[in-house]
């Protein structure tokens, strides 16, 4: 068995004296592990870092075997990502989200969103908006997608500012006003198609976004598996909070 594909490194662990087991999210073969000979060496360390993009060639005698990788760098992001706390936490959290996907099951949209998110980590606000969208995409890919296209009560597609915590559907301003204290806030950048790039956010939008996705991830995905939110998610949100406070302190 043999294939070649684009991939992003999610994690690496040492195996024996000199090898490493590398976990990739690939474009066409999903989340996939393989062994890299000499992967524990100092020469390979810069390449085998989470967030780096590679061209991966995988080979095994049988499809169900772990197999061996040969990896070639296509984009080395790790050195830049390690330069900011929000990026370090963000990459770790993205990897934990990708691990919610079944192994060896292709999820090309998730792969593309991961690339988009990793390439926009320079700006903490844009990175946060992308990460929230990534969490929404994970929910959808696992069968728990939110319906943010129209009001669940009236069918209206305008003034969608709430989300029902029960159904995961959008609610308009007028329909939700009597129950606003029980509803989740829908951030502007999630209801504006033009904000796909991640722009147009406010600090409150970001916190509302993480509250929204966090609620449904915990209830529908994590708790049924006996899991909770990653420490890296909390670290990322704390780093964003500190970054938002800096201008006021200067």
Curated annotation (Swiss-Prot):
Going by the UniProt record, its keywords in alphabetical order are: DNA damage, DNA recombination, DNA repair
Q: Which GO terms describe its biological process?
A: DNA recombination; double-strand break repair
Any Pfam family from its record, for instance, is RecO_C
**Domain of life of the organism in this record?**
Bacteria
Q: Which Gene Ontology CC terms are recorded?
A: bacterial nucleoid
User: InterPro entries from the xrefs?
Assistant: ARFGAP/RecO (IPR037278), DNA_rep/recomb_RecO_N (IPR022572), NA-bd_OB-fold (IPR012340), RecO (IPR003717), RecO_C (IPR042242)
What does the UniProt function comment say about this protein?
Involved in DNA repair and RecF pathway recombination.
Q: Belongs to which family? A: Belongs to the RecO family.
Q: Which NCBIfam families match?
A: reco (TIGR00613)
Give the protein's recorded name: DNA repair protein RecO
Q: Which organism is it from?
A: Rhodopseudomonas palustris (strain TIE-1)
- Organism lineage: Bacteria, Pseudomonadati, Pseudomonadota, Alphaproteobacteria, Hyphomicrobiales
State the encoding gene. recO
